[in-house]
């Protein structure tokens, strides 16, 4: 049995092992930092009592904040896209059991949208089916093995906050140990092994979390998810994968739908807008809340409840295609570079 097969069969065990290791390392690091460094060295040996108490309080507050955000990430979840019925794209389709297609959506060469066979629903926007959650996740970003949680539309901001505050904590720990190393060596011939281990762990962790945080700032500014970044890198190595990027667009000028392929000359995210608006789509419209770990709660229903407008059904998970994408598609249509063209009966029927 290969490792990949073993991991798949034992996923319900492995999803707890790594987060448990991370939690134990946090507990060990807090003990080593607060007791071995702050109390035994800074407080007792050097007599810097106010500094030691301040460092201990800062570490404990950040620890509590990080664990609280972790709990919120898992408890809130990534979100659950409501069920969306097929679009009304053919005359023979049942009007009551279909939905009106948005102006632009990802499709196959014939103009049919992406379908999830597990949820029996359309995948709207950047929705992906998550095997860990058992349902479709809106704006699926990735599965974080360190936290044992799927990151998506609903808990994305919490994840960014988790990475940020973890990076701050590790930075404080690493800098504090580095500053006091010389003074400690004057009192003791050997540096405590726990402090050496903590210095290494905090240094590596700081580089990882700070690098991850900077990367996510860039991803958000470009309106990209982690899975899209991986896909873009694959396309650079294998250009033929660009055949998968097909979008169906309703042209209001002639009232036809066109299926257009986004070639490799199309750069960036389909949803890209102004960089600040991109960040607000991920972090929220209020910058004051970007650093406050508050969960986002709203009513979710796995059923469409008879609603036919897709944007209303998936609200508040609705995502708009960027203006530069629309301009690119229109230019392809004007030059005749499209794959398929058809009349959409759904719009005619809904306007009768």
Swiss-Prot record:
GO terms for cellular component: endoplasmic reticulum; Golgi apparatus; membrane. The active site is at residue 144. It is found in: Membrane. The chain crosses the membrane at residues 12-32, 53-73, 159-179, 195-215. Residues 114-164 form the DHHC domain. Keywords: Acyltransferase, Lipoprotein, Membrane, Palmitate, Transferase, Transmembrane, Transmembrane helix. It holds the Pfam family DHHC. GO terms for molecular function: protein-cysteine S-palmitoyltransferase activity. PROSITE patterns: DHHC (PS50216). Belongs to the DHHC palmitoyltransferase family. PFA5 subfamily. The DHHC domain is required for palmitoyltransferase activity. This is Palmitoyltransferase PFA5.
